[in-house]
UniProtKB/Swiss-Prot annotation:
Allows the formation of correctly charged Gln-tRNA(Gln) through the transamidation of misacylated Glu-tRNA(Gln) in the mitochondria. The reaction takes place in the presence of glutamine and ATP through an activated gamma-phospho-Glu-tRNA(Gln). GO terms for molecular function: ATP binding; glutaminyl-tRNA synthase (glutamine-hydrolyzing) activity. This is Glutamyl-tRNA(Gln) amidotransferase subunit B, mitochondrial. It holds the Pfam family GatB_Yqey. It comes from Paracoccidioides lutzii (strain ATCC MYA-826 / Pb01). Keywords: ATP-binding, Ligase, Mitochondrion, Nucleotide-binding, Protein biosynthesis. One of its GO terms (biological process) is glutaminyl-tRNAGln biosynthesis via transamidation. One of its GO terms (cellular component) is glutamyl-tRNA(Gln) amidotransferase complex. The lineage of its organism: Eukaryota, Fungi, Dikarya, Ascomycota, Pezizomycotina. Its main location: mitochondrion. It is found in: Mitochondrion. Belongs to the GatB/GatE family. GatB subfamily. InterPro entries: Asn/Gln-tRNA_amidoTrfase_suB/E (IPR017959), Asn/Gln-tRNA_Trfase_suB/E_cat (IPR006075), Asn/Gln_amidotransferase (IPR018027), Asn/Gln_tRNA_amidoTrase-B-like (IPR003789), GatB (IPR004413), Gln-tRNA_amidoTrfase_suB_CS (IPR017958), Gln_synth/guanido_kin_cat_dom (IPR014746). It catalyses: L-glutamyl-tRNA(Gln) + L-glutamine + ATP + H2O = L-glutaminyl-tRNA(Gln) + L-glutamate + ADP + phosphate + H(+).
């Protein structure tokens, strides 16, 4: 449970986290307060309009359409890939260095410093406590339960969890932060000195070889800002539901030297956070954002003059903010790398600044000068006490931590029960917050039970994977639907595959059955097969020969190409013709191919 105690250093409460439950105390306002969305009084927060001035970019005489720029870039990338190049030749004398700051929304019921709900899909400005909008007299109340998913993340990322951590104020003014400061953990974060291993299967750059380890400087808890929406009239609408939602900021060391590896790092961290239930959603739903710090230096000129997070010898860095996809991370780094190299080659100097990047763009743009520690005026938050984490809590969380993605990947590939390819296993792990992987495992377990009577060793895991990823995935995509494990229950999928593997139905019949269930047929698989008379009535050898000879007679040119030029891939097309002129539900593709090979290649 969570006990309130007095700090030796101040009269405000601190929180001691020990095993057994949670009990929040020390609130100025003992219950969550919501601000009315009605009326025109000074406390209304339904909408806050802020006028801004923007200037449009002008097109010069050398303007090149964006579509043409992207096509030329894609063409150059394909050419480089064909030549086996790992980076453009003109950049070989330049070293790129990247550090990443990842902001992830924690999966919690309440906000970080109030009891207001942390729900993300509610009506705008309906979950707002007094402290969230910095009303006079309101104070933060740390919600200890929000620390649990943060600790899971730190353990999964191999961090040293600090027994004592504290909150600080980071001062700046912007419309999405009404207090004029953000509460974070600058000086004493709750986790330090972590690491993440990226293997070749994670999509790292070729120059990184079989794998690379990236250090994590620290992970800190902090509050999120309001969600803003810009209108064409240079006005912003603000939703304060997001203010004080709990975030963790994961800061990597600047040890990444390739855009592809940077994107792989963000992807891997997201997968790990999702696997341990630390975060709500991933990048695709806005639950995770990344800032990247980019610098370059010329190898032939020795080490650079700058340092970042204790790593020395670097070039001057710039920061690119709010990247919301893995592709955006990679493309923004490429664009900024190319810009910095061009500036340095022209004799210029790189300025430390914050830059932005827009999806589909080919270059970054300056947003503002880069603030430093002095600009933010960091100071300990006088309204919040230290957070003390008990060793027993860490032991309990470690014992209950789910299997991490790398171990899970190894199991899916190496265990004969599953026997998946690395690509299929990775896809299952990353899709739908792990729900599709759970569905796959359920279907495999059911199929194992259905095939206990077979003497051969079970090898249906790969078949189930193909159906889950390709057949079911294709139907979901075609229907523009999100993942739903009840669309085709795992029991139904296993029964279809069982019938197919026992040659009781054909492949085309299996797909038809699957589509019927997907479209809402509530009958059992056995009932559908019986009602629709779908059981395979095998053709005799003589019937297969007759069908094959008819197809060969209709396609003499193709038969000649197969026989004389050994174009064996065309046999599959002839099998399709046998299915067309015969009974599709009775023709077995494997037997039809065997007869064709026997007649053509004899």
């Amino acid at each position: 449970m969570i006990r309130q105690c007095l700090s030796r250093r101040a009269a405000y409460p601190c929180y001691r986290i020990v095993a057994g439950g949670t009990e929040p105390t020390g609130c100025l306002y003992p219950q969550s307060c919501r601000i009315s969305r009605r009326g025109r009084d000074w406390s209304s927060t339904s909408r806050r309009a802020i006028d801004t001035q923007t200037s449009g970019a002008s097109n010069g005489a050398d303007y090149v359409p964006l579509r043409q720029q992207l096509k030329e870039q894609a063409r150059a990338k394909r050419a480089a890939k064909r030549k086996g190049e790992v980076s453009p030749p003109e950049h070989e004398d330049w070293e790129l260095t990247v550090g990443i700051e990842i902001h992830a929304q924690l999966d919690t019921d309440t906000k970080l410093f109030s009891r207001a709900s942390a729900a993300i899909d509610d009506v705008p400005n309906s979950n707002v406590a007094l402290f969230d909008v910095a009303l006079p007299g309101s104070q933060p109340l740390f919600q200890p339960a929000t620390l649990i998913p943060a600790l899971r993340a730190a353990i999964a990322l191999n961090c040293d969890v600090q027994r004592v951590s504290r909150f600080d104020r980071k001062h700046y003014f912007y419309q999405d932060q009404p207090a004029g400061y953000q509460i974070t953990q600058y000086y004493e974060p709750y986790a330090k000195n972590g690491s993440i291993w990226l293997g070749s299967h994670d999509g790292i750059a070729k120059e990184d070889g079989v794998g690379v380890e990236i250090g994590i400087k620290q992970i800190q808890m902090e509050q999120d800002t309001a969600k803003s929406q810009e209108l064409p009239s240079s006005t912003y609408l603000l939703d304060f539901n997001r203010v004080s939602r709990p975030l963790i900021e994961i800061i990597t060391l600047p040890q990444i030297h390739s855009p592809a590896t940077a994107a792989a790092c963000v992807r891997k961290i997201q997968t790990i956070l999702q696997s341990v239930g630390a975060v709500t959603t991933g990048m695709e739903m806005g639950g995770l954002r990344a800032d990247v710090n980019v610098s370059v230096r010329k190898r032939s000129e020795g080490v650079g003059d700058h340092q970042y997070h204790g790593v020395t010898g670097l070039g001057q860095r710039t920061e690119i903010k709010n990247l919301s996809s893995f592709k955006a991370v990679e493309d923004a780094i490429i664009a900024e790398r190319d810009r910095q190299i061009a500036v340095l080659r022209a004799g210029g100097a790189i300025e430390g600044e914050t830059r932005g990047w827009t999806l589909g763009s080919t270059e970054t743009r300056k947003l503002r000068g880069k603030e430093g520690e002095v600009d933010y005026r960091y100071m300990p938050d006088p309204d919040l006490g230290p957070v003390i984490i008990g060793y027993d809590v860490l032991c309990e969380l470690k014992a209950k931590l789910p299997v991490l993605p790398d171990a899970l990947l190894h199991n899916l590939v190496q265990d004969p029960k599953y026997g998946l390819s690395i690509d299929d296993a990775k896809t299952l792990i990353e899709l739908d917050d792990g729900d599709r992987l759970d569905y796959y495992k359920d279907a495999v377990d059911i199929l194992v039970t259905l095939q206990k009577d077979l003497s051969d060793d079970f090898s249906g895991g790969k078949v189930v994977g193909n159906w889950v990823l390709h057949e079911l995935g294709g139907l979901l995509t075609k229907s523009n639907l999100h993942w739903d494990s009840e669309r085709v229950p795992a029991q139904s999928l296993a029964e279809i595959i069982n019938l197919l593997s026992r040659n009781k139905i054909t492949g085309s019949t299996a797909k038809s059955l699957f589509a019927m269930v997907f479209d809402g047929d509530k009958r059992s698989i056995g009932q559908i097969v019986e009602d629709e008379n779908l059981l395979l009535q095998s053709l005799s050898r003589e019937e297969y020969i007759a069908l094959a000879e008819e197809v060969m007679r209709q396609n003499p040119k193709m038969v000649m190409e197969i026989c004389e030029k050994r174009q064996l891939g065309k046999i599959g097309w002839l099998v399709g013709q046998i299915k067309r002129i015969g009974d599709r539900n009775r023709v077995e593709a494997q037997k039809a191919e065997e007869i064709l090979r026997e007649l053509i290649l004899k």
